[in-house]
Amino acid sequence: MATSDIQVKELEKRASGQAFELILGPRSKEAAPEFPLSPPKKKDLSLEEIQKKLEAAEERRKSHEAEVLKQLAEKREHEKEVLQKAIEENNNFSKMAEEKLTHKMEANKENREAQMAAKLERLREKDKHIEEVRKNKEGKDPGEAETN
């Protein structure tokens, strides 16, 4: 488009800016349009070309299906690994808890046995003391009877 086909008309001028109006001249018949008005006509496809396109589409479909199946298999494998790891961690936790409980029970048993042994020792000491007091008392009783 030539510059002589364009007219610039100033509409108003303000502090905020200016406004213009562009007036375009009529199109010349010599200028070719920049884009075609209608899409180019498609050529008629032969049976072989159609068959090739169908086969290519089938290959793409099969390839896509294989990719999806591969992704599903990988996902299932990952799920199996995660599940196996969770089971293993659970077993380890159970084993550790059982060992801890067994150790605690053994410690409690040893503590209880030690307390029982200490009580028995105190009872023996008391019995021994009582026996000594009895012997001392029996030894003193005949003498006390004479003095009364």
Curated annotation (Swiss-Prot):
PROSITE patterns: STATHMIN_1 (PS00563), STATHMIN_2 (PS01041), STATHMIN_3 (PS51663). Residues 41-140 form a coiled coil. One of its GO terms (cellular component) is membrane. The keyword Cytoplasm applies. It is found in: Cytoplasm, Cytoskeleton. The modification Phosphoserine is found at residues 16, 38, 63. Involved in the regulation of the microtubule (MT) filament system by destabilizing microtubules. It prevents assembly and promotes disassembly of microtubules. This is Stathmin. It comes from Gallus gallus. The gene is STMN1.
